[in-house]
Amino acid sequence: DELLTNEQRWLPILARAVSVQVPEPIFIGAPSATFAHPWSVVPWFPGTAASDLDVAQRNSCMEGLLDFFIDLHVQALPGAPENPYRGLAINRREFDESFRRAVAGRQDAAALLERWLAWRGVPDWDAGDVWVHGDAHPGNLILDASGDLAAVIDWGDVTAGDPASDLAT
């Protein structure tokens, strides 16, 4: 419920700040005896999730994605959601054995582990909390027929924090 209420509260504000479409609620429903959770009606965005395209096709949206992050990564407003995982500096996250398992068996496993450990050594972001999407992976990036970034969806993890965390999902 908290993820949805974060979207309901903050997307009307963030929609005016970014250069692409976001699922700003058209209607917000309250929990009831029929359905015990908050709910929203949001617009449908035609296009294709970047995750459904090959890497070369995804590359066409990079300029739009950069513009989106420039628009989004500004000082967060007071009361912005806090998230115990998203928005934290990458080097402050618990190193998870799942990373070692994920790269095990790859020819480049040693290089990936070395790179991960180097990233963890980067100094923390200290320029103040900015808006962070929190889950900006290719499945949440909608590209139009031209391959341009048209919409960014799934804002349940929106938070204030380190902008680099948006590049880690």
In which residue ranges do the predicted regions lie?
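Active-site Asp-x-Gly
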Residues: 129-132, 137-169
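Short, structured helix-loop boundary elements
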Residues: 1, 59-62, 89-92, 106-114, ...
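A generic local structural motif
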Residues: 11, 26-28, 116-120, 138
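Short glycine/proline- and charge-enriched loop/turn segments
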Residues: 43-47, 97, 156, 166-168
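ATP-binding pocket architecture of kinase catalytic cores
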Residues: 1-89, 126
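Active-site catalytic-loop/activation-segment of kinase and kinase-like phosphoryl-transfer enzymes
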Residues: 40, 67-70, 83-124, 147
